[in-house]
């Protein structure tokens, strides 16, 4: 079992602590000069892959990111956490803004085949678009079994036991490898990269390739019509009686 190899997808997103601003032309959100970091769910996926390696269940952990040159910073973070090497699928910034789950899933599927990995790990969703689609699409392209929203992952021989929380209970899946797993928040607590590991990460290899090298066309089939801030909420009012409530609702045109 020590010969297993894992591919972990990591996405560069606007940091969760940053207040999002919409562009004046409403074509997207402002990203220039804004702090970015690794998607929190991706951090959990990296942590799980590294833990499997520390248990000698996985031989190699490969971190991959698809996007502009700055994505290499995100890959370096994964390398500092314990990934062995990185792959950067370089996409120009303007094109990267239009990347959707379908295009990224095509890239991940091709890389999984090229690298002959046994396990693809990724966050269940990204905090920027909240799509929750990439893992499922990747499994579909590869025709591999999938375990989504994983809260616990255990290797049992040639199968992967995945526990996932569902409404009213816990569901257990046993996936025959190779497989795709998406990480839930409850899967683990990601480690902080230590300074020595950050320094070591600078010496680890990051291979830079183009989507065309994988035979993938990243042309999006979707177009964004408009991006807008949510409407401002108005302050509520207190009423003393049911009659006052009915009168107020009539006043604002709700009844």
UniProtKB/Swiss-Prot annotation:
Top-rank lineage group of the source organism: Eukaryota
Molecular function via GO: electron transfer activity; nucleotide binding
Localisation per UniProt entry: Mitochondrion matrix
Keyword Aminoacyl-tRNA synthetase belongs to the record: no
Phosphoserine found at: 223, 226
Record-linked SMART domains: ETF
List of residues binding AMP: 9, 39-42, 66, 123-134
Transmembrane parts of this sequence: none
Pfam family, one: ETF
Residue numbers of N-acetylalanine PTMs: 2
Modified residues (N6-succinyllysine): 210, 248
Annotated spans, Recognition loop: 183-205
Modified residues (N6-acetyllysine): 200, 210, 238, 248
InterPro entries per the UniProt record, alphabetical: ET-Flavoprotein_bsu_CS, ETF_a/b_N, ETF_b, ETF_beta_N, Rossmann-like_a/b/a_fold
GO cellular component, one term: mitochondrial matrix
Residues that bear N6,N6,N6-trimethyllysine: 200, 203
Modified residues (N6-methyllysine): 200
UniProt KW keywords: Acetylation, Electron transport, Methylation, Mitochondrion, Nucleotide-binding, Phosphoprotein, Transport
Post-translational modification: Methylated. Trimethylation at Lys-200 and Lys-203 may negatively regulate the activity in electron transfer from acyl-CoA dehydrogenases.
GO biological process: amino acid catabolic process; fatty acid beta-oxidation using acyl-CoA dehydrogenase
Family to which this protein belongs: Belongs to the ETF beta-subunit/FixA family.
Record text about domains: The recognition loop recognizes a hydrophobic patch at the surface of interacting dehydrogenases and acts as a static anchor at the interface.
PANTHER family: ELECTRON TRANSFER FLAVOPROTEIN BETA-SUBUNIT, ELECTRON TRANSFER FLAVOPROTEIN SUBUNIT BETA
Quaternary structure annotation from Swiss-Prot or TrEMBL: Heterodimer composed of ETFA and ETFB. Identified in a complex that contains ETFA, ETFB and ETFRF1. Interacts with ACADM.
Function: Heterodimeric electron transfer flavoprotein that accepts electrons from several mitochondrial dehydrogenases, including acyl-CoA dehydrogenases, glutaryl-CoA and sarcosine dehydrogenase. It transfers the electrons to the main mitochondrial respiratory chain via ETF-ubiquinone oxidoreductase. Required for normal mitochondrial fatty acid oxidation and normal amino acid metabolism. ETFB binds an AMP molecule that probably has a purely structural role.
Protein name from the UniProt record: Electron transfer flavoprotein subunit beta
Annotated organism of origin: Pongo abelii (Sumatran orangutan)
